[in-house]
């Protein structure tokens, strides 16, 4: 307990008082490289605390990290009332070739409308259509 007391009462205040924080805006431009290096650790600590607070209290961050969103589900909107989405397409009905969606983002189900391009940009995925040729 004495080590924690020593850290809070003397070590941390001495460290913070010795940081090269300038009094004026122009003083920031006069800092040396060594001074900038000395400011990196407390900046990282403050940024980490801020980011942790953001994840803990921001609703958008909570939604993004929740298990609901990251459940591994592919289909979020097409024919949700069915237990399994199956489409039968007769090869005889295909003129020359047809592109079928695999990303579940299309508005023209089951045909691909290129929605996977935006999906790939947002997620870093590389999904594309299934192309069937006659």
Curated annotation (Swiss-Prot):
Cofactor(s) needed: [2Fe-2S] cluster
Transmembrane feature ranges: 36-58
Predominant subcellular localization, coarse grouping: endoplasmic reticulum
Membrane topology: Single-pass membrane protein
Cytoplasmic side: 59-134
One Pfam family here: MitoNEET_N
UniProt name for this protein: CDGSH iron-sulfur domain-containing protein 2 homolog
The keyword Calcium appears for this protein: no
Keyword list, A-Z: 2Fe-2S, Endoplasmic reticulum, Iron, Iron-sulfur, Membrane, Metal-binding, Transmembrane, Transmembrane helix
Residues binding [2Fe-2S] cluster, per UniProt: 101, 103, 112, 116
Signal peptide coordinates: none
GO biological process, one term: regulation of autophagy
Alphabetized GO MF terms: 2 iron, 2 sulfur cluster binding; metal ion binding
Co-factor binding comment: Binds 1 [2Fe-2S] cluster.
Compartments it resides in: Endoplasmic reticulum membrane
UniProt-listed InterPro entries: CISD1/2, FeS-contain_CDGSH-typ, FeS-contain_mitoNEET_N, MitoNEET_CISD
Native species: Drosophila willistoni
Record bears the keyword Hydrolase: no
Family: Belongs to the CISD protein family. CISD2 subfamily.
Positions in the Lumenal compartment: 1-35
Gene3D superfamilies: CDGSH iron-sulfur domain, mitoNEET-type
Gene Ontology cellular component annotations, sorted alphabetically: endoplasmic reticulum membrane; mitochondrial outer membrane
């Amino acid at each position: 307990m004495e080590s924690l007391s020593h850290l809070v009462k003397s070590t941390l205040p001495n460290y913070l008082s010795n940081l090269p924080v300038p009094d004026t805006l122009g003083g920031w431009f006069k800092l040396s490289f060594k001074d900038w290096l000395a400011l990196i650790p407390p900046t990282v600590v403050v940024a980490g605390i801020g980011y942790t607070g953001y994840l803990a209290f921001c609703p958008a961050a909570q939604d993004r990290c929740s298990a609901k969103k990251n459940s591994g589900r592919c289909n979020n909107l097409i024919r949700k009332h069915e237990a399994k989405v199956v489409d039968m397409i007769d090869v005889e009905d295909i003129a020359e070739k047809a592109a079928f969606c695999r990303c579940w983002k299309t508005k023209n189900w089951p045909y691909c409308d290129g929605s996977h391009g935006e999906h790939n940009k947002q997620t870093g995925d590389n999904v594309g259509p299934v192309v069937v040729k006659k």
